[in-house]
Protein backbone atom coordinates (compact mmCIF):
# COMPACT_ATOMS: atom_id res chain seq x y z
CA UNK A 1 0.00 0.00 0.00
CA UNK A 2 0.90 3.69 0.09
CA UNK A 3 2.38 3.32 3.57
CA UNK A 4 5.19 1.24 1.99
CA UNK A 5 6.02 3.90 -0.58
CA UNK A 6 8.76 5.74 1.43
CA UNK A 7 10.55 2.45 2.19
CA UNK A 8 10.38 1.34 -1.44
CA UNK A 9 11.82 4.67 -2.62
CA UNK A 10 14.69 4.64 -0.09
CA UNK A 11 15.60 0.98 -0.65
CA UNK A 12 18.60 0.09 -2.83
CA UNK A 13 16.31 -2.28 -4.71
CA UNK A 14 12.62 -1.56 -4.24
CA UNK A 15 10.38 -4.63 -4.55
CA UNK A 16 6.65 -4.59 -5.16
CA UNK A 17 3.96 -7.07 -6.13
CA UNK A 18 1.79 -6.89 -9.23
CA UNK A 19 -1.40 -5.84 -7.43
CA UNK A 20 0.21 -3.05 -5.37
CA UNK A 21 -0.92 0.55 -5.78
CA UNK A 22 0.21 2.33 -8.92
CA UNK A 23 2.53 4.72 -7.05
CA UNK A 24 4.36 1.83 -5.35
CA UNK A 25 4.71 -0.09 -8.62
CA UNK A 26 6.17 2.94 -10.39
CA UNK A 27 8.72 3.48 -7.60
CA UNK A 28 9.79 -0.18 -7.39
CA UNK A 29 12.79 -1.58 -9.23
CA UNK A 30 11.38 -5.10 -9.24
CA UNK A 31 7.73 -6.09 -9.59
CA UNK A 32 6.90 -9.68 -8.63
CA UNK A 33 4.28 -11.31 -10.84
CA UNK A 34 3.56 -13.77 -8.04
CA UNK A 35 4.04 -13.61 -4.29
CA UNK A 36 7.15 -15.78 -4.11
CA UNK A 37 10.55 -14.45 -3.04
CA UNK A 38 12.26 -17.49 -4.55
CA UNK A 39 11.85 -15.72 -7.88
CA UNK A 40 14.42 -13.17 -6.70
CA UNK A 41 16.96 -15.88 -5.95
CA UNK A 42 16.40 -17.47 -9.35
CA UNK A 43 16.82 -14.09 -11.04
CA UNK A 44 20.06 -13.35 -9.19
CA UNK A 45 21.51 -16.75 -10.11
CA UNK A 46 20.47 -16.36 -13.75
CA UNK A 47 22.12 -12.94 -13.85
CA UNK A 48 25.35 -14.23 -12.31
CA UNK A 49 25.40 -17.15 -14.73
CA UNK A 50 24.92 -14.87 -17.74
CA UNK A 51 27.61 -12.47 -16.48
CA UNK A 52 30.06 -15.34 -15.90
CA UNK A 53 29.56 -16.61 -19.45
CA UNK A 54 29.99 -13.07 -20.77
CA UNK A 55 33.31 -12.76 -18.95
CA UNK A 56 34.42 -16.08 -20.42
CA UNK A 57 33.67 -14.86 -23.93
CA UNK A 58 35.41 -11.50 -23.53
CA UNK A 59 38.56 -12.81 -21.85
CA UNK A 60 39.06 -15.91 -23.98
CA UNK A 61 38.31 -14.11 -27.25
CA UNK A 62 40.67 -11.25 -26.39
CA UNK A 63 43.37 -13.77 -25.49
CA UNK A 64 42.93 -15.72 -28.73
CA UNK A 65 42.97 -12.58 -30.87
CA UNK A 66 46.03 -11.22 -29.06
CA UNK A 67 47.93 -14.46 -29.66
CA UNK A 68 46.97 -14.54 -33.35
CA UNK A 69 47.92 -10.91 -33.89
CA UNK A 70 51.36 -11.49 -32.38
CA UNK A 71 51.87 -14.55 -34.60
CA UNK A 72 50.68 -12.76 -37.76
CA UNK A 73 52.96 -9.78 -37.11
CA UNK A 74 55.95 -12.06 -36.54
CA UNK A 75 55.16 -14.13 -39.65
CA UNK A 76 54.67 -11.03 -41.81
CA UNK A 77 58.16 -9.86 -40.87
CA UNK A 78 59.91 -13.23 -41.23
CA UNK A 79 58.10 -14.92 -44.13
CA UNK A 80 58.16 -13.97 -47.85
CA UNK A 81 54.36 -14.43 -48.03
CA UNK A 82 51.28 -13.98 -45.86
CA UNK A 83 50.78 -16.85 -43.38
CA UNK A 84 47.03 -16.88 -44.10
CA UNK A 85 44.78 -15.12 -46.60
CA UNK A 86 42.23 -12.58 -45.45
CA UNK A 87 39.28 -14.82 -46.38
CA UNK A 88 40.82 -17.70 -44.41
CA UNK A 89 41.21 -15.45 -41.37
CA UNK A 90 37.60 -14.33 -41.67
CA UNK A 91 36.43 -17.93 -41.94
CA UNK A 92 38.47 -18.89 -38.88
CA UNK A 93 36.97 -16.01 -36.90
CA UNK A 94 33.49 -16.97 -38.10
CA UNK A 95 33.86 -20.47 -36.69
CA UNK A 96 35.14 -19.12 -33.40
CA UNK A 97 32.33 -16.56 -33.17
CA UNK A 98 29.71 -19.24 -33.86
CA UNK A 99 31.17 -21.33 -31.07
CA UNK A 100 31.15 -18.37 -28.71
CA UNK A 101 27.53 -17.57 -29.60
CA UNK A 102 26.41 -20.71 -27.78
CA UNK A 103 28.33 -19.83 -24.60
CA UNK A 104 25.13 -18.52 -22.93
CA UNK A 105 24.04 -22.18 -22.78
CA UNK A 106 27.28 -23.28 -21.16
CA UNK A 107 27.35 -24.66 -17.63
CA UNK A 108 28.76 -22.35 -14.96
CA UNK A 109 30.71 -23.72 -11.99
CA UNK A 110 28.86 -23.43 -8.69
CA UNK A 111 31.65 -21.41 -7.04
CA UNK A 112 31.12 -18.62 -9.60
CA UNK A 113 27.52 -18.23 -8.45
CA UNK A 114 28.19 -17.82 -4.72
CA UNK A 115 29.11 -14.14 -5.02
CA UNK A 116 28.86 -11.37 -7.63
CA UNK A 117 31.65 -11.26 -10.21
CA UNK A 118 33.34 -7.97 -11.06
CA UNK A 119 34.27 -6.56 -14.44
CA UNK A 120 37.77 -5.10 -14.57
CA UNK A 121 39.84 -4.00 -17.54
CA UNK A 122 42.95 -4.61 -15.44
CA UNK A 123 42.21 -8.31 -15.05
CA UNK A 124 41.35 -8.54 -18.76
CA UNK A 125 44.77 -7.18 -19.72
CA UNK A 126 46.50 -9.50 -17.26
CA UNK A 127 44.58 -12.53 -18.55
CA UNK A 128 45.19 -11.64 -22.20
CA UNK A 129 48.92 -10.98 -21.90
CA UNK A 130 49.46 -14.10 -19.79
CA UNK A 131 47.78 -16.71 -22.01
CA UNK A 132 48.15 -14.96 -25.40
CA UNK A 133 51.92 -15.53 -25.76
CA UNK A 134 51.42 -19.25 -25.10
CA UNK A 135 49.25 -19.39 -28.21
CA UNK A 136 51.80 -17.36 -30.19
CA UNK A 137 54.59 -19.73 -29.14
CA UNK A 138 52.85 -22.73 -30.68
CA UNK A 139 51.90 -20.74 -33.77
CA UNK A 140 55.58 -19.96 -34.29
CA UNK A 141 56.46 -23.61 -33.71
CA UNK A 142 53.96 -24.51 -36.43
CA UNK A 143 55.52 -21.92 -38.75
CA UNK A 144 58.95 -23.48 -38.27
CA UNK A 145 57.66 -26.99 -38.95
CA UNK A 146 55.71 -25.95 -42.04
CA UNK A 147 58.35 -23.66 -43.57
CA UNK A 148 61.48 -25.70 -42.91
CA UNK A 149 60.23 -29.31 -42.76
CA UNK A 150 56.85 -30.16 -44.26
CA UNK A 151 56.47 -27.79 -47.20
CA UNK A 152 60.07 -28.21 -48.50
CA UNK A 153 59.72 -31.99 -48.16
CA UNK A 154 56.50 -32.09 -50.19
CA UNK A 155 57.43 -29.42 -52.74
CA UNK A 156 61.01 -30.59 -53.30
CA UNK A 157 63.10 -27.76 -51.88
CA UNK A 158 63.22 -24.48 -49.98
CA UNK A 159 60.82 -21.73 -50.97
CA UNK A 160 63.38 -19.57 -52.80
CA UNK A 161 64.63 -22.44 -54.97
CA UNK A 162 61.22 -23.49 -56.29
CA UNK A 163 59.44 -22.62 -59.51
CA UNK A 164 56.42 -20.32 -59.44
CA UNK A 165 54.04 -23.31 -59.58
CA UNK A 166 55.79 -25.07 -56.70
CA UNK A 167 55.92 -21.84 -54.70
CA UNK A 168 52.15 -21.55 -55.08
CA UNK A 169 51.75 -25.08 -53.68
CA UNK A 170 54.21 -24.25 -50.88
CA UNK A 171 52.18 -21.18 -49.87
CA UNK A 172 48.85 -23.01 -50.09
CA UNK A 173 50.12 -25.87 -47.93
CA UNK A 174 51.62 -23.48 -45.38
CA UNK A 175 48.41 -21.45 -45.11
CA UNK A 176 46.26 -24.57 -44.83
CA UNK A 177 48.52 -26.01 -42.15
CA UNK A 178 48.35 -22.89 -40.01
CA UNK A 179 44.61 -22.54 -40.59
CA UNK A 180 44.00 -26.03 -39.19
CA UNK A 181 46.39 -25.58 -36.27
CA UNK A 182 44.83 -22.23 -35.36
CA UNK A 183 41.33 -23.69 -35.60
CA UNK A 184 42.13 -26.63 -33.33
CA UNK A 185 43.92 -24.55 -30.70
CA UNK A 186 41.34 -21.74 -30.67
CA UNK A 187 38.43 -24.13 -30.28
CA UNK A 188 40.05 -26.32 -27.62
CA UNK A 189 41.43 -23.42 -25.57
CA UNK A 190 37.84 -22.38 -24.99
CA UNK A 191 37.26 -25.69 -23.22
CA UNK A 192 40.33 -25.23 -21.01
CA UNK A 193 39.82 -21.61 -19.99
CA UNK A 194 36.05 -21.76 -19.45
CA UNK A 195 36.63 -23.21 -15.97
CA UNK A 196 39.36 -23.22 -13.34
CA UNK A 197 38.66 -26.89 -12.69
CA UNK A 198 39.75 -29.84 -14.82
CA UNK A 199 37.67 -29.54 -18.01
CA UNK A 200 35.45 -32.42 -19.16
CA UNK A 201 36.06 -34.24 -15.85
CA UNK A 202 35.45 -31.87 -12.93
CA UNK A 203 33.53 -29.34 -15.02
CA UNK A 204 31.59 -30.45 -18.07
CA UNK A 205 30.50 -27.95 -20.72
CA UNK A 206 26.91 -27.68 -21.87
CA UNK A 207 25.76 -30.20 -24.45
CA UNK A 208 25.30 -27.51 -27.06
CA UNK A 209 28.85 -26.23 -26.49
CA UNK A 210 30.24 -29.76 -26.82
CA UNK A 211 28.19 -30.51 -29.92
CA UNK A 212 29.16 -27.33 -31.77
CA UNK A 213 32.82 -27.81 -30.78
CA UNK A 214 32.98 -31.33 -32.21
CA UNK A 215 31.00 -30.41 -35.32
CA UNK A 216 33.18 -27.36 -35.98
CA UNK A 217 36.43 -29.32 -35.63
CA UNK A 218 35.24 -32.10 -37.95
CA UNK A 219 33.83 -29.82 -40.66
CA UNK A 220 36.76 -27.40 -40.74
CA UNK A 221 39.34 -30.21 -40.66
CA UNK A 222 37.68 -31.69 -43.76
CA UNK A 223 37.33 -28.28 -45.44
CA UNK A 224 40.69 -28.32 -47.34
CA UNK A 225 39.70 -31.46 -49.30
CA UNK A 226 36.36 -30.01 -50.42
CA UNK A 227 35.69 -27.83 -53.49
CA UNK A 228 34.99 -24.90 -51.14
CA UNK A 229 38.40 -25.34 -49.54
CA UNK A 230 40.10 -25.31 -52.93
CA UNK A 231 38.22 -22.10 -53.80
CA UNK A 232 39.68 -20.59 -50.62
CA UNK A 233 43.22 -21.50 -51.67
CA UNK A 234 43.58 -24.55 -49.43
CA UNK A 235 45.10 -27.90 -50.24
CA UNK A 236 44.95 -31.43 -48.82
CA UNK A 237 47.57 -32.02 -46.14
CA UNK A 238 49.75 -35.17 -45.99
CA UNK A 239 49.29 -37.66 -43.11
CA UNK A 240 52.55 -36.61 -41.44
CA UNK A 241 51.09 -33.15 -40.89
CA UNK A 242 48.22 -34.55 -38.82
CA UNK A 243 50.72 -36.48 -36.70
CA UNK A 244 52.47 -33.18 -36.00
CA UNK A 245 49.11 -31.48 -35.39
CA UNK A 246 48.09 -34.01 -32.73
CA UNK A 247 51.44 -33.72 -30.94
CA UNK A 248 51.37 -29.92 -31.19
CA UNK A 249 47.81 -29.62 -29.85
CA UNK A 250 48.45 -32.03 -26.96
CA UNK A 251 51.60 -30.13 -25.97
CA UNK A 252 49.69 -26.85 -26.23
CA UNK A 253 46.87 -28.08 -24.01
CA UNK A 254 49.32 -29.41 -21.42
CA UNK A 255 51.23 -26.12 -21.31
CA UNK A 256 48.01 -24.10 -21.02
CA UNK A 257 46.87 -26.38 -18.19
CA UNK A 258 50.11 -25.73 -16.31
CA UNK A 259 49.90 -22.01 -17.06
CA UNK A 260 46.30 -21.95 -15.83
CA UNK A 261 47.27 -23.59 -12.54
CA UNK A 262 50.04 -21.01 -12.06
CA UNK A 263 47.69 -18.13 -12.95
CA UNK A 264 45.04 -19.32 -10.48
CA UNK A 265 47.64 -19.75 -7.73
CA UNK A 266 48.93 -16.24 -8.32
CA UNK A 267 45.58 -14.47 -8.77
CA UNK A 268 43.26 -16.73 -6.70
CA UNK A 269 40.85 -16.98 -9.62
CA UNK A 270 40.64 -17.53 -13.36
CA UNK A 271 37.57 -15.69 -14.63
Regions found by a protein language model. Give the residues of each.
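C-terminal transmembrane module of polytopic membrane proteins
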Residues: 93, 147-151, 155, 169-271
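Membrane-embedded transport module
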Residues: 1, 11, 16-198
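Conserved cytosolic catalytic loops of P-type ATPases
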Residues: 4-5
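Basic, alpha-helical nucleic-acid-binding regions used in initiation and control of genome expression
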Residues: 8
Amino acid sequence: GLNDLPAVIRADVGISVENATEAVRESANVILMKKDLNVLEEGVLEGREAFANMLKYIKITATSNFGNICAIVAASVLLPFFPMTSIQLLLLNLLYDILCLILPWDHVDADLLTKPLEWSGRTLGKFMTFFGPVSSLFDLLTFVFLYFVLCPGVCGGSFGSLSAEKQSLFISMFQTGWFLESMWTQVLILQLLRTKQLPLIQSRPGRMVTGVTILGIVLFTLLPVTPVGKMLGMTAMPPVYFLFLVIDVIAYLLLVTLAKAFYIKKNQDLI
